[in-house]
Amino acid sequence: LGAFAQEQKGVSEVERNYQAGTSPLTTTPMVQSTNPKAPPMSLVEFEAARKIYFERCAGCHGVLRKGATGKPLTPDLTVAKGTDYLKVFIAYGSPAGMPNWQTSGEMDEATVDLMARYIQHDAPTPPEWSLDDTKKTWKVTVAPKDRPTKKMNNFNIENIFSTTLRDTGEIALIDGDTKEIISIIKTGYAVHISRMSASGRYLFVIGRDAKINMIDLWMAKPDSVAEVRIGLEARSVETSKAKGYKDKLVIAGAYWPPQFTIMDGDTLEPKKIVSTRGMVVGTQEYHPEPRVASILGSHYKPEFIVNVKETGKTLMVDYSNLDALKITEIGSAPFLHDGGLDASKRYFMVAANNSNKIAAIDTKDGKLAGLTDVGKIPHPGRGANFTHPQFGPVWSTGHLGDDTISLIGTDPKKFKQYAFKEVAKLKGPGGGALFVKSHPKSKNLWSDAPLNPDPKISQAIVVYDINNLDKGYKTLPIAEWADLKDDGAKRVVQPEYNKAGDEVWFSVWSAKNKESAIVVVDDKTLKLKKVIKDPRLITPTGHFNVYNTQHDVY
């Protein structure tokens, strides 16, 4: 059995790094249950194992251990296997995809024994999160009546960048014109995304701990004016964009509990909570914890487009009457994650990452327009739109699990034969890509690979000429240009254009105790334009240009 397990090649280092991110549930108090059939564990051991589980395992096996992208690990399955059997598979992994935790050096023998016993006990359940719980966290620090009635600063708001400072629980607002930091704002832990109000005045950020901050960019020094926590773990926030509803509502989706919350657009006062627990598309099996992934505000209707990860459903949530909420359910494929609009802003292209598919949601007609196979574990961010010389308008995504970029046709009128199909693959340097990006005024397509284990790949960026894709990519040594003097990881992450579309910004991301930077490149010449260094730029990761985020330009 051990020899067989050692042959496993199911999980790459890239995939393990992506799936095994620390969960905020690590520090959430939970009760140890007793299972008389399970091997004994002290309370201290149980707490240690629970912490490791939420740091390393919950991303694949689920909060309740009932399975997500990985297999279920519930006592009805694990007790019968026995401790010795489980230790082998934790230590050596399996061809089906279990990482080899001990032989990779991630766990020692004692930790493997601890985890083998832990998964034979009943899974501790984190608490639910009600409207009352949400209201207890809701704070309005500057009431709407006390906010400016006009812009009180000289910043070019449309060219401000919101940059996540991942490990400090902050964002940096950076002036895209001067390249100077405007302010550092305290937020939730590890801000996942920044999103704009339809008017462009308010910036909304959400941490992995489900805390939302509402930031007023009209203030003399932009700062948070309201905050709320919508659960225990989350990834997504969005605002209403439809005519007559601009700036009226905000929505956020939680990983735990599996639900979304609709709030007032001026104050973040919670108004409505909707659970996403339900049946998986295709198998029609009940799933107890389907996480809310990406959310988009429709430009066509008063609807939020909510992607539910494990069930593979896209929910078209009509917010015109919260007291009589209407939801249209569109099934595509399990493990829906991130995505963005095509160039026409009609079709929401969303990755079903562990299904290796891209779904195209027609936001105007409210239906599934297409579902196409792509590479291994697509991760587009919001993707990248450009016009291909042969296939017309395409939307593109990179992949975590292979070295390709998939191009998908998005014009069913003029290029019907290519619509919502993978029309081409570009070869990249290696897996581990998180974001691709282009711009309507650019001839370039950019891709990162920060999770690639090879520093030569993770510390660089690749760029393609969209008019000469057959020539392959050029590699730019972004981390080298940053000229950081220590031995940090220097992972280059998330290309982001300025408003004009003539600069591309990159984070050079190292650990909290190492130096990081932001590198700005001239999009036309591909030459270094500016390196932004500041002691306050600690673990910069994602960044979002106000105008491009507000208008879905990517």
Predicted regions and their residues:
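Sequence/structural segment immediately N-terminal to covalent heme-attachment motifs in c-type
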Residues: 42-63, 85-92
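Asp-box/WD-like beta-propeller blade repeats and closely related beta-sheet repeat scaffolds
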Residues: 224-312, 323-331, 336
